[in-house]
């Protein structure tokens, strides 16, 4: 994590709060657990709780290590923002690396606890990049978050990603394509998106 995080965060958040909503190029990552229902049918509730907490403990560091913030938890899903408040020219590549590390951490956990083939637990991840507005939404209860189509598309990609998959848009893939010459391409019809989306599965 950046050593001057507190100072940088304070500066960036102060700027955004003064201007209400600020357009910023960012990369959005959504990650959600897959196989929770199936797993709950094979192990006791107390053991399931331990597994989930172990997973959560390994999820956050993969994101923080790439100078990103976890903006919110939505059920079992997490929304991470790259390039705010810490700005990085390589924020797109960082998001992809964080996603792959997260998948690695999840796989290591499965091996440690000895999950069998029919006791599946995995993560589906969606990543998109572009300009978003950072700011507060709401009146009585204010939520500081990223706003815009980029967020929605990243969320929809996550919903289309299978367990163990990192699914990214063409905009993201353009930044990392040299690292993934064998990436699988997909034409995706996503809810709330009027056009077909070119997606790529990275591993």
Regions found by a protein language model. Give the residues of each.
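Regulatory cytosolic signal-relay segments
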Residues: 1-25, 180
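Alpha-helical scaffold within the catalytic cores of cyclic-nucleotide enzymes
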Residues: 53-68, 85-125, 129, 149-151, ...
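Catalytic strand-loop-helix junctions within cyclic-nucleotide turnover domains
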Residues: 84-91, 125-144, 163
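Catalytic/regulatory signature loops of cyclic-dinucleotide turnover enzymes
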Residues: 128, 149-170, 191
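Cytosolic regulatory/linker segments at or just downstream of nucleotide-handling modules
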Residues: 163-203
């Amino acid at each position: 994590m950046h050593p001057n995080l507190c100072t940088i965060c304070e500066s960036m958040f102060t700027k955004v709060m003064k201007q209400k909503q600020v357009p910023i190029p960012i990369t959005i990552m959504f990650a959600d657990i897959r196989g929770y229902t199936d797993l709950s049918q094979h192990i006791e509730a107390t053991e399931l709780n331990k597994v989930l907490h172990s997973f959560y403990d390994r999820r956050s560091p993969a994101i923080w290590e790439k100078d990103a913030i976890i903006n919110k938890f939505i059920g079992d899903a997490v929304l991470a923002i790259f390039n705010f408040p810490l700005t990085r020219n390589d924020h797109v590549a960082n998001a992809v690396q964080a996603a792959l590390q997260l998948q690695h951490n999840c796989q290591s956990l499965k091996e440690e606890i000895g999950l069998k083939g029919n006791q599946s637990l995995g993560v589906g991840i969606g990543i998109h990049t572009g300009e978003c507005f950072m700011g507060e939404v709401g009146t009585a209860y204010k939520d500081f978050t990223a706003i815009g189509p980029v967020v929605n598309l990243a969320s929809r990609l996550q919903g289309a990603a299978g367990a163990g998959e990192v699914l990214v848009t063409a905009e993201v893939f353009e930044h990392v394509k040299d690292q993934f010459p064998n990436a699988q391409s997909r034409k995706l019809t996503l809810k709330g998106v009027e056009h077909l989306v070119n997606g790529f599965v990275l591993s």
